[in-house]
Amino acid sequence: MLHLHIFSWVIGIILFIVSYISFTKTGAPKKAYKPLHMTLRLFLVLILFSGVWQVVEEFATATGSTHMLLTLKMICGIGVVALMEVTLVRKQRGASHKGLFWGTIALIIVTMALGIILPGGPISNMFVITK
């Protein structure tokens, strides 16, 4: 399930950026915007599903060492998903969106950093830190 989660995040971030830049200079969405946005929504559902699955698996093992950090990552991840959607909708409507875009990018970086340092992440695997 971890591989599905990582794959969904990578594709989701790419789709978010491509959807964000798929507007004309006048601010109208291009033809490719709607399919890109719908595909992004599909991947956002996959991200949420695989993330919740991982949280349930972690809490079921009850090791207790990383529950607070995992909960913080879960909250950040839900925030990223919400900000992605709100940013694109506000841009489509012509409302201010640049602050939301940069806030989304910042929260993506924080969420990815939390995912890297959690057990099962690359840093934990590199130094053989087990649960």
Curated annotation (Swiss-Prot):
Taxonomy, superkingdom: Bacteria
Disulfide bond positions: none
Residues annotated as transmembrane: 1-21, 42-62, 69-89, 99-119
Location within or outside the cell: Cell membrane
Keywords carried by this UniProt record: Cell membrane, Membrane, Transmembrane, Transmembrane helix
Main location: membrane
Topology of this chain in the membrane: Multi-pass membrane protein
GO cellular component, one term: plasma membrane
Protein name, UniProt field: UPF0344 protein Sca_0577
Organism: Staphylococcus carnosus (strain TM300)
